[in-house]
UniProtKB/Swiss-Prot annotation:
Keywords: Cytoplasm, Elongation factor, GTP-binding, Nucleotide-binding, Protein biosynthesis. One of its GO terms (biological process) is ribosome disassembly. It comes from Campylobacter concisus (strain 13826). GTP binds at residues 18-25, 82-86, 136-139. This is Elongation factor G. It is found in: Cytoplasm. InterPro entries: EF-G-like_DII, EFG_II, EFG_III, EFG_III/V, EFG_IV, EFG_V, EFG_V-like, G_TR_CS. Belongs to the TRAFAC class translation factor GTPase superfamily. Classic translation factor GTPase family. EF-G/EF-2 subfamily. GO terms for molecular function: GTP binding; GTPase activity; translation elongation factor activity.
Length: 692
């Protein structure tokens, strides 16, 4: 049994979460540099950042997969999980949020709170991830720390509490005032750009520092009654008391500590690392996570080395040298290489091959992983993202992650027959890595269909097939994932009876079919009294309804948000069978749903466009042409922000159109928001197209 090197209270599992251009990868890089793990600093500008280790990321300069990296700072082990900042990859963000204990939210001092930041912030709230804010790019023209503070309060509805304020901004950004110690840290560029000196607070920011120190003390005093008493008695709080108060508020998420700097110029990173170890939680300081047993009994899993092993597989990657890597977060107990673990979701035993700690794309072999740690396992056969690995003595299932349903599909075909098999293997591996990506076969055309969260998502999948698996694929036109639903309640009787010599078939059902609120899925209720339909046939009725849902009513799209109640029927002693009841239910459902005002639903995307004012009219006119509904118009740093809902069907190729309309000066972000009924004329077109 290996010994634990870092005690649990000195472990920090953190993520760097941010909008696409806030400088997240650069910040992660600098953290690795200052913690001594990385010798040549990688720059995103020249495509060499250690964190971005997949080729497409290097080209696009956006971070796609969360690489988990272990670094050390002042005796603390910091496991850094890099999260993507582009909306097509929200699944990756969700997945990393699930295993983080704390996060550093990076904002650009010029761009402030971007639409994407709101999505990431919501996800962090959902998983109760305490966070600190780092306002980056303080050296840029238009940098304004205090405006970002205001935006966090207004747009994210958080309580930002600066624990530093900047000294100067733009070209004059020299350093920061530490409001806890009331000292200035100044980076003198000429000497070593990474080193800073501690000085007295410069006269020009003294008043501002006093004002913000008072705000900090007030916020801190609200976290604890004894501090509140001292505050009202006018007594000074000690440095230790202030730190304790900041941490308490941060863990309860009533305070969001704010720091600033410029990662690119190496300013502000050391104090940021100090804040990570001082204010973000250790694994044993966060709430225990919930698990269930197979019989539905709930249980809480405390973060501790004692007790039976339990871990969550949160990421699967294919590494060109080692094969498949499964990243796990250990919540309880420990795991040794060469041992066995039980996958409680797939219900099978897994042999643990080698255990690795990853440093971006370098790896270190280890013999054991302990509670609170993150590492990668080589050689797991059946484990998927979101599965639990546990001890056979305590088969707990840790809470599952929710994965969104794909909204866009394209048909792919290999360019040569020889690639057919290679493509199937490639797609299977990619689908294992990414649960928001699905592969299916179109029954009518026999084509392979891939589905995902957006155009960029699928582009990158096709790109990876070529690079990693050497499969060159032709890609068809994007198809929208429409759905169907009903608008009114109906009752439907259906009798399925066949008598043609020998044993017949007999199934007879009465179904009540009703609409449910949006995003409710499917609900089946058995309301049979007096055994008019025997118990053993009820599951067949439900199965028949479910199968009918899949093939749709109007145009063959899946039906959702429907409740079906089986309330009457009859059976035949000899001729009734599961098959007969399944068919009766399936045909009955289809017939009933047609009378229940069936409609087609389409995915609506939340679109935000940032454009210079002179193009605003064109952009809005174009969105209206695409059946968009403009919700709001806003000013942000001299550019106009247009927020709208648009049907996905109208948004293909939007980036190219927007570029030509605004001479490349506008940017946009788009994510799936909800399903909405399509207008009648569009519905008729869809039905005509589908039914040929």
């Amino acid at each position: 049994m290996a010994e634990r090197k870092t005690p649990l209270h000195k472990v920090r599992n953190i993520g760097i979460a941010a909008h696409i251009d806030a400088g997240k990868t650069t910040t992660s890089e600098r953290i690795l540099f200052f913690t001594g793990m990385s010798h040549k600093i990688g720059e995103v500008h020249d495509g060499a950042a250690t964190m971005d280790w997949m080729e497409q990321e290097k080209e696009r300069g956006i971070t796609i997969t969360s690489a988990a990296t272990t670094a050390f700072w002042k005796g603390y082990q910091v496991n850094l999980i890099d999260t993507p900042g582009h909306v097509d990859f929200t699944i990756e963000v969700e997945r990393s949020m699930r295993v983080l204990d704390g996060a550093v939210a990076v904002f650009c001092s010029v761009g402030g709170v971007q639409p994407q930041s709101e999505t990431v912030w919501r996800q962090a709230n959902k998983y109760h991830v305490p966070r600190i804010v780092f306002v980056n790019k303080m050296d840029r023209i238009g940098a304004n720390f205090f405006r970002v503070e205001e935006q966090i309060r207004e747009r994210l509805k958080a309580n930002p509490v600066p624990i530093q304020i900047p000294i100067g901004a733009e070209d004059n950004f020299k350093g920061v005032v530490d409001l806890v110690r009331m000292k200035a840290y100044v980076w003198n560029d000429e000497k070593k750009p990474t080193d800073y000196v501690e000085e007295e607070i410069p006269a020009e920011v003294k008043d501002k520092a006093e004002e913000y120190r008072a705000k900090l003390i007030e916020a801190v005093s609200e976290t604890d009654d004894s501090l509140m008493e001292k505050f009202f008695a006018g007594e000074e709080l000690t440095e230790e008391e202030i730190k304790k108060g900041i941490k308490a508020g941060c863990l309860r998420m009533t305070i969001t500590p704010m720091l600033c700097g410029t990662a690119f110029k190496n300013k502000g990173i050391q104090p940021l690392l100090d804040a990570v170890v001082d204010y973000l939680p250790a694994p044993d300081e966060i709430a225990a996570i919930n698990g269930v047993y197979e019989d539905g009994t709930e249980v809480t899993v405390e973060s501790t080395d004692d007790g039976e092993f339990a871990a969550l597989a949160f990421k699967i990657m294919t590494d060109p040298f080692v094969g498949q890597l499964t990243f796990i977060r250990v919540y309880r107990g420990s795991l040794e290489s060469g041992s066995y673990a039980y996958n409680t979701v797939q219900d099978c035993k897994e042999r643990i091959g080698r255990l690795l700690k990853m440093h971006s794309n370098k790896r270190e072999e280890i013999t054991e992983l302990f509670a609170g740690e993150i590492g990668a396992v080589v050689g797991l056969k059946n484990t998927l993202t979101g599965d639990t690995l546990a001890s056979e003595k305590d088969k707990v299932i840790l809470e599952r992650m929710d994965f969104p349903e794909p909204v866009i599909s394209v048909a792919v075909e290999p360019k040569t027959k020889a690639d057919q098999e290679k493509m199937a293997i490639a797609l299977q591996k990619l689908a294992q890595e990414d649960p928001s990506f699905r592969v299916s076969t179109d029954e009518e055309s026999g084509q392979t269909i891939i589905s995902g969260m957006g155009e960029l998502h699928l582009e990158i999948i096709v790109d990876r097939m070529l690079r990693e698996f050497k499969v060159d694929a032709e890609v068809g036109q994007p198809q929208v994932a429409y759905r169907e639903t009903i608008r009114k309640a109906v009752e439907q009787e259906y009798k399925y009876a066949k008598q043609s010599g020998g044993r017949g078939q007999y199934g007879h059902v009465f179904l009540r079919i009703e609409p449910l609120p949006a995003a409710s899925g499917f609900e089946f209720v058995n309301d049979i009294k007096g055994g008019v339909v025997p118990k053993e046939y009820i599951p067949a009725v439900e199965k028949g309804c479910k199968e009918a849902l899949q093939s749709g009513v109007l145009a063959g799209y899946p039906v959702e948000d429907v409740k079906v109640t089986l309330f009457d029927g009859s059976y035949h002693e000899v001729d009734s069978s599961e098959m007969a009841f399944k068919l009766a239910a399936s045909m009955g459902f289809k017939e009933g749903a047609r009378k229940a005002g069936a409609v087609i639903l389409e995915p609506m995307m939340k679109v935000e466009v940032e454009t210079p004012e002179e193009y605003m009219g064109d952009v809005i006119g174009d969105l209206n042409k695409r059946r968009g509904q403009v919700n709001s118009m806003d000013d942000r740093n001299g550019v106009k922000i247009i927020a709208a809902y648009c049907p996905l069907a109208q948004m293909f190729g939007y980036s190219t159109d927007l570029r030509s309309m605004t001479q490349g000066r506008a940017t946009y972000s788009m994510e799936f928001d909800h399903y909405e009924e399509v207008p009648k004329n569009v519905s008729e077109e869809i039905i005509k197209k589908r039914n040929g």
